[in-house]
Amino acid sequence: DFPAAPDGTPASQDFFTGMPSKCAVGNILYSWNYAYNTENVKGTPKTIKDFFNTKKFPGKRAIYKSALTNLEIALAADGVKMGKGGALIYKRLEEEGGVDRAMNKIKELCTDPNGGCVFWSAGAQPPELLVAGEVVMATGWNGRFFNAEVGENAPIAQVWDGQGLDYEYFALVKGGPDEANAKKALAMMT
């Protein structure tokens, strides 16, 4: 049980959909989106399709070194509508050929002579790769791009089309040490 927000909003109505669950509560909400180097890209990419369009926007892309989010953005770029919470994308991924369709889109990008892929595994890498000019576009986390763009005055701009929302959780082990105080701390942090 969480206390009401300062404005009186009940905790059950004060969290993003799905963040409080029976076992955990979300502590940060962020977006998987992409950004581009404004000095190295001619024109203004606006859609997730633009991320995959190496004819209009030539140059290497940086993508996460996992299927996580790559499959979703590949299908969105291939014309699959997102649906609420990405429901239509996930429905397509569950269907026969859905994963293959997404993987083929990624393979096309990574083997395209006008493009190619650099794979990243740490959140700081996408803005670093963009600023260094190693890639012209990169997928990543909106907060990392924001910090580089605003905090470091990096020449990058974010594109929100096709973004995926994600969150991290706090969880407590039932019957764990000092459970009562752990619950109080969790309530204060959220």
Language-model segments: which ranges?
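Extracytoplasmic ligand-binding site segments that recognize negatively charged/polar headgroups
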Residues: 1-129
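Hydrophobic residues within well-ordered alpha-helices
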Residues: 129-133, 172
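Extracytoplasmic/periplasmic substrate-recognition and gating elements
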Residues: 137-144, 149-190
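Structured loop/turn residues at beta-strand edges in well-structured enzyme cores
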Residues: 46, 133, 154
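Alpha-helix initiation and capping sites
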Residues: 64, 96-100, 120-124, 132, ...
